[in-house]
Amino acid sequence: MSKYDFKKIEKKWQNYWDKHKTYKVNEDPNVPKEKRIYILDMFPYPSANGLHVGHPEGYTATDILTRYKLLNGFNVLHPMGFDSFGLPAENYAIQTGKHPKKITEKNIEKFKEQIKALGFAYDWDREIKTHDVNYYKWTQWIFLQLYKKGLAYTKEIPVWYCPDLGTVLANEEVIQTPDGPRSERGFHKVERKPLRQWLLKITKYAERLIRDLEEVDWPDSVKEMQKNWIGKSTGVEIEFLIKESKEKIKVFTTRPDTIFGVTYLVLAPEHPMVDKITKDELKPIISKYKDKEILKSDLERTSLEKDKTGIFTGAYAINPITKEEIPIWIGSYILGTYGTGAVMSVPAHDERDFEFAKKYNLPIKQVVSQTGTNEVLIKPFTENGISINTPTEFNNLKTIEVKTKVIKWLIENKMGQEKVNYKLRDWIFSRQRYWGEPIPILFDDNLNEIPLNDDELPLTLPDIENYKPSGTGESPLSKIKDWVNVKRNGKIYKRETNTMPQWAGSCWYYIRYLDPHNKKEFANKEKINYWMPVDLYIGGAEHSVLHLLYARFWHKVLYDLGYVNTKEPFRKLINQGMITSFAYQDENGILIPNDEVEKKDNKFFSKKNNKELKQIIAKMSKSLKNIINPDDIIKEYGADSMRIYEMFMGPLTDSKPWNTQGLIGIFRFLNKIWLIKNKELTNETPPKEIISELHKTIKKVTEDIETLNFNTAISTLMIFINELLKHEKNYLKIFRPISIILSPFAPHLGEELWEFMGEQSSIFKNAKWPKYDLNSIIDDTREIVLQVNGKTKDKIMIKKDTDEETLKKIAFNNQKIIQNINNKQIIKIITVKDKLVNIVAK
């Protein structure tokens, strides 16, 4: 009897797939569009740490679906590549003195080795790397299309600059401290510095970016996050005349009905009117206040938890309707980049205004109430209601009626207009860094922009030794004079020395996969029409806003220019849940690294002081040393075991804790299949009850794969394998279809079983997904409840009259039960035939 030698089997089939290019995409144009599917993973950034077990979760899900579709005769596009430009590689290069290109390419080789070890069905001939010159040539080309369409422009804007590091920092690299902002790296002082930056006019697409979310099958949470990020508000822009001046201040509000309760205006410290209206005697103190506030991040200034600060300018504005004089303040919580950079403050009906008014003893006038009568305000009334304390024609009306009348009055008197506002800002698209795509623009002596011609692309990143920051806030490229200075028609021009952000390459990579070796265009139009849109896109929820929003923006521009055929790039989106790990906490709530923890008598203790620790679920991190390396898992249990375990842990979209005990159960499951393979293979007709169970299994697994419920599909397979083990013979008419439906989950074992049955080529080239026959199904299943201490943790379907021992095994192999009894003492197990298993534990 042979042993399940997973190492030998997995190596054998990985070599076979590579040699025969088993997963090379079919380019036959005669394959109809309805029989094609584009399945895509969010491609990884190749960090020096390599993969941990969380990465393959999404990759395994797409791989199962890919193999299932191949077995159903589909033409499947399932590529992989690397998001290889970006800040982490450059920072690591600066720290180590190694070139970012060498670091990146070494990391990619490690990633590929790990990915291939898991047996994923990628067409590696389509691999892309965003730092590859043949790729970023087309990133530059797309930038030029944006530029020609008027969607790319330069502007001087304030950025974080660190004099000690000699470089500009991203918001994420700056820490706010009581002593002011500091760099995350080195804890150096940072300052706001105006620098010329490239921006992309994503704001031009704000409305479409909201509207077209209705056309995609995405999680509601992601749609809501994008809508909130774009931040659409419908309201009125109102003009307030400044007393003793012809100047006006424009404010935007969604509640024009509250204009009667305005008791002051607040301007952003950076508002252009501040210097014009401030009284001379107040200018020194206001200048000092401005300098302090603009050093803060937008998040810090607008945080509800932060104290609101402000200062009076000495100037007054006139309420356009009531003609009341109202003081003009500047306040930290108003941003110059949102709306008009000024607000009309109605403290009776806005939380921030209420807090500010209380702090500075400003009037609070109620003009809306729930009942239509004056009330004592302990907190602002922010709901709709009945107007009070307003001119007669506006008084005692519902909010919606007052809004309508106020808007009409403002428009008729040319003091306001209806307007839609968005929180979304234009995308800052330049970085003062080396490791990114060079921007294909030249400047003359007058800083006029000259875009490169298409035949001048790619503008290659010079291979330099000194890629450290320039020390002036400029990119390291600014130091390469023979690269920066370009002679044209006898004149000297200067290249743009900023580079593109990491997001650039990931904005369009899904298109390049369609035609990765095309040297004439970014992708062939026929191939775009054939494959797009991406049918299923799987990746982490952390990309819900930036990557997905930027990719949608670029896609819409390409759609408007006629280069792509769909309004949206990704038809269906799934966010896989996070795979977490155990961590350990002391009595003060401090997390202790795993290598400082020891287990004694099912309890956990600190190695340093022998104090007992609490086991909790936490995100995998280097500092906690609770990262699980897939290489170790594959070495001990095999890739097929790891793949199945990650899918069996729970629903794809749920967060789940890693537990090696569950993995051992999966390994045993695969060994059971091998035991069946070792039985006498026969062409005899199987008993009716086995045929019935087979068709039930095919039906359930088919339905579960289609709906991405992989955990229940695996559970169904386990139940059927346990049933087959009871029989002395291995029936070919059963083993053949069961090997096929197993193969998407355990492709190496599936191939081995296929070959064992006498087949010569890959199961994914030669097999067809079995069809179930409803007439063959005998309904003898029962739903049972799995409980811990009397509380239901799961419900599963089992065969009627399942014996007590099998029930117990099913319960103890159930992932939800494992999670709830982990490190607990089992007191007793209660089973009720065909109804429940209750595990009593403490």
From Swiss-Prot:
Top-level enzyme category: ligase
Cellular-component GO terms for this entry: cytosol
Binding-site residues, ATP: 622
Reaction equation(s) it catalyzes: tRNA(Leu) + L-leucine + ATP = L-leucyl-tRNA(Leu) + AMP + diphosphate
Localization: Cytoplasm
Entry EC no(s): 6.1.1.4
Any one biological process term the GO annotation gives: leucyl-tRNA aminoacylation
Signal sequence region: none
Major location (coarse): cytoplasm
Molecular function per GO: aminoacyl-tRNA deacylase activity; ATP binding; leucine-tRNA ligase activity
UniProt protein name: Leucine--tRNA ligase
Organism: Borrelia duttonii (strain Ly)
Organism placement in taxonomy: Bacteria, Pseudomonadati, Spirochaetota, Spirochaetia, Spirochaetales
